[in-house]
Amino acid sequence: IANIGEIAANVICGNGHEGKAYAITGPELLSGTDMAKIFTDVTGKQVDYVSPDEDTVLNSLLDSGWPQWQAKGMLELFDLFASNQAAVISPDGEQLLGRPLTTLKEFAQQNKAAFI
């Protein structure tokens, strides 16, 4: 999250960004299981990735007030991620930041106190 804020500040305050679009991604491709393992390793507490079925997700969204069309659209987005169609790493973030992006493990280590 800090990377995104710093990138945004660089674009807003810097020159030469007018009319440009950037693909900002993280520095690594991680599954939910990968992310859970990172948090388990960093915190020493077991973290499990749980992927609820579509009906559970849909009902949860509808119960929290989402319109049906929007909830269905969110399920489509989740399917896109689950099928790895969005599994892309772009160099834009690192180029705009001028240094390597923070990995999830680095983020978890830097913010460990917030997670334990």
Language-model segments: which ranges?
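Mid/C-terminal beta-alpha module of Rossmann-like enzyme folds, strongest
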Residues: 5-73, 85-116
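A conserved structural motif in NAD(P)-dependent oxidoreductases
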Residues: 1-3
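Short glycine/proline-rich, acidic loop/turn segments that cap or connect secondary-structure elements
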Residues: 78-84
